[in-house]
């Protein structure tokens, strides 16, 4: 999963897709933090990666709801666009 995110970051840079790039860089940051956590042995299982992705998607949706409540639809739209990118990596439900 980590390698897929890294290669998709390169593709987003080449395509100059700023929203996708921001979302994927955020995901990679959390993956690196999980890999370097004490006891992680510099590894990240797919199960742990999916938990991180689900957490980030939920946080993004919650943040967007707060933005809407504060009449900041522009920020909510940006946040929801990033959530959509993250949800591409989650299994379909």
Predicted regions and their residues:
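Charged, compositionally biased, marginally structured helical/coil segments
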Residues: 1-93
């Amino acid at each position: 999963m980590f390698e897929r995110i890294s290669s998709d970051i390169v593709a987003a840079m080449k395509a100059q897709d700023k929203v996708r790039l921001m979302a994927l860089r955020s995901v990679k940051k959390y993956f690196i933090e999980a890999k370097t956590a004490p006891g992680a042995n510099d590894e990240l299982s797919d199960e742990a990666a999916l938990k991180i992705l689900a957490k980030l998607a939920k946080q993004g949706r919650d943040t967007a709801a707060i933005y809407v409540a504060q009449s900041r639809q522009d920020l909510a739209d940006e946040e929801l666009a990033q959530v959509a990118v993250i949800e591409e990596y989650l299994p379909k439900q």
